[in-house]
Amino acid sequence: AGDAVLVSLAKLLRYSLRDIDLPARLGGEEFAVLLPGEGAEGAIILAERLRSAVEQDAVAFGGKHLNYTSSFGVISLPAQGTAGKLDAQVAKNVALLKSRENTDVADILYSLVDAALYQAKETGRNRCMPVDLANLADQIST
């Protein structure tokens, strides 16, 4: 059944994303989609649209139709050329995380969005959970 779901999901992504968007399977049942030039609001709208489409999808397997759901963590950075306009608190929070985790910004963003994904799963599944870079106090204090 898992392979049938992956095939169906790949088709759904192909028809739902722009040509410049980049979906990637991270492993198992985890995927990432890079949305160049898309802001936080657009990313959340797309994640919700994908979540709804997955919820309505059914996969034929073993003579039955199987439904499945999805959960999303969503994170966004400013578009290229506007990074200098990052709110001072966001920049401070990201710098603090970088110094604590001794890693680069991409790894920090992945850690934050992965935590949001698991929060979405823990709070009922089949939902989208955005990361608010301006309010990282919870992630920094732990």
Each language-model region and where it sits:
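Glycine-rich helix-loop "coupling/hinge" segments at transmembrane-helix boundaries
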Residues: 1, 62-64
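Conserved long alpha-helical elements within nucleotide-processing catalytic cores of c-di-GMP signaling
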Residues: 1-15, 24-28, 32-33, 40-48, ...
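Short helix/loop segment flanking the catalytic signature motif in cyclic-nucleotide metabolism enzymes
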Residues: 5, 32-52, 65, 70, ...
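Short, cationic motifs built from Arg/Lys/His that form the positively charged side of catalytic pockets
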Residues: 12, 18, 25, 49-51, ...
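Conserved amphipathic alpha-helical interaction elements at protein-protein interfaces in regulatory
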Residues: 15, 19, 37, 52, ...
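A short pre-motif secondary-structure segment
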Residues: 22-25, 66
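A general secondary-structure junction signal
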Residues: 27, 63, 70-78, 130-135
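Catalytic-core segments of nucleotide cyclases and related cyclic-nucleotide turnover enzymes
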Residues: 40, 44, 77-142
